[in-house]
Amino acid sequence: MGAKVEKSCVLRTTFLVKVCKHENYSQLLYVPLHAMKKYCFTLLAVLVAVTVQAQKNHNMEVAKNLDIFNQVYKNLDLLYVDTLNPGEVVGTGIKAMLRSLDPYTEYYPESETKNLKMMLTGKYAGIGALIHYHQKQKRVVIDEPYEGMPAAEVGLRKGDIVLSIDDSTMTDKDVSYVSSHLRGDAGSKFVLKILRPSTGKKMDFKITRRNIKLPELPYYGMLEGNIGYINLNQFTEGCSKDVRRAFVDLKKQGATALVFDLRSNGGGSEMEAVDIVNLWVDKEQTIVENRGKISQANHAYKTRLEPVDTQMPLVVLVNGETASASEITSGALQDLDRAIILGTRTYGKGLVQIPLDMPYNTNLKLTTSKYYIPSGRCIQAINYKRNGTGGYRERVADSLTHVFYTAAGREVRDGGGITPDVEVKNDTIPNIAYYLSASAQDSTEVMFDWVVDYLNRHPAIAPAREFHLSVEDFEDFKQKVVKSGFTYDPVSKKQLEELKKTAKAEGYYEQAKDAFDLLESRLKHDVATDVDKHSEILRQMLELDIITAYYYQAGGIEAGLQYDKQLKEAIRILQSPEEYKKLLRPKKTA
């Protein structure tokens, strides 16, 4: 038998061989090719039939559920006690459906399509100013006019209270309402009536709306030691050209190293991210690959141009609000060992959306794929897909992430965003600073009002990098805070109150009352003492607000660099060539 088998192996090359294992032995089976072909055709036919049936079942489910939705709405419209607004009811249904998927798949009714366009392009027609709701005045105020925009050109100032737009009163409206009226068609004119707190006078401004492009690159400049610095806010159309111009200009000024700041950059255009990476890596390098359910969603993006500089040392700054296209940029530069990533772990948005035109001038922004950077990893941090236990939207645990390798062999991981090569946490903002700032929901606006008053008393200040508040100025601010009656509850006090409630519910409060009283007395705060305790950060916040009012975003960023702990570490690394090179080499294993 063995000889016959051996002979067959040599002579009958048209036979296929299959190995069958059974218990403790293996048997070689020789199957004629025509029989195997018949088997394959049969298997293929079965697979096709199963696929067709599965698709048929899916289509039936779609039709069934659309019919159910249609019948539900028809009965609501026919029988519900009140008359329904079709657009509102169906729109609510659509948005509820999309909420079950991910936060990036969104429906835009006709009234909101301009918002989508602004998000995609960074452009809108309006006056070019940041506004916010003043908690004390209970009105919308001008917060920050943008440099070179209509608001700044006509003379609007920080603190001006919006009273009316043409004949429409704005005194009892929220930010969204006022913003929608400030925007309009480019070239359209309107009259804005404001109240200027410093004089108590009402003033009319005739304004012509213009196309406003949000400043995606608010500042770039030279730092100590021939190090260039570029700050990018978002990845809108054309931003790669702006970054290229800034980088070339910095090289002309003598930059021999670069800090590229992507902190709090929420992303934007994927192609712009590829073109920015292209500044520092060679042509024809794959930067990102999209993979989706349908073939049209699959695409690999490569660098298209000759680079500007492939050798200059580069540090990219990131934080927890660095997302999407920012993560493509920082992740690709990390995977290609072209830059040191410094800061804190990024947001972790590895999903790609496309805008789709829908009937009746509506739009749908739809997640169609995940993106994968050069090492092959996807950095999506949250799993939005429902699992078998009914849970969803769970952050990928570090223990479930997978190891990938950079071009030089450094270990990196997928899931959970981009982990920096050098982790540096910025100092946290104390509770009192949050409640004093205008961003706090229940802010007394005392900090905002003091800054507005300072601006009115000082028609000019020193250059951005040189300006500092005097001791007398800060003391005046502290007295204003104390006299305003400002108070706040530290987190520790709130947690103590929760602990008291729990102790009472469980019956332990009375026996522990003395301990609670002692702890409460220790946690009491004095506002004046707290202002002194946190004077450094409060002084910085005041100075940056004032500088931004005089020198716009560029001035505020420039002045803030002197306080930037992460930037200082980036500069130190760039000034240490051996440490920089070591960070880009794989770690030696024992």
Where are these predicted regions, by residue range?
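Short clusters of hydrophobic/aromatic residues that line enzyme substrate/ligand-binding pockets
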Residues: 107, 287, 301, 379, ...
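A structural signal for short loop-to-beta-strand junctions that line the ligand-binding cleft
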Residues: 127, 306, 365-367
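Extended, small/polar residue-biased N-terminal targeting/export presequences
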Residues: 80-141, 187-209, 214-219, 561-571, ...
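Cleft-lining beta-strand/loop regions that shape enzyme active-site pockets
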Residues: 53-65, 69-86, 141-145, 149-158, ...
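Bacterial Sec-dependent N-terminal signal peptides
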Residues: 1, 5, 9, 13-59
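Conserved functional hotspot residues or short segments at active or partner-binding sites
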Residues: 378-590
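Polar, glycine-rich mid-to-C-terminal structural blocks
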Residues: 325, 337, 342-344, 348-410, ...
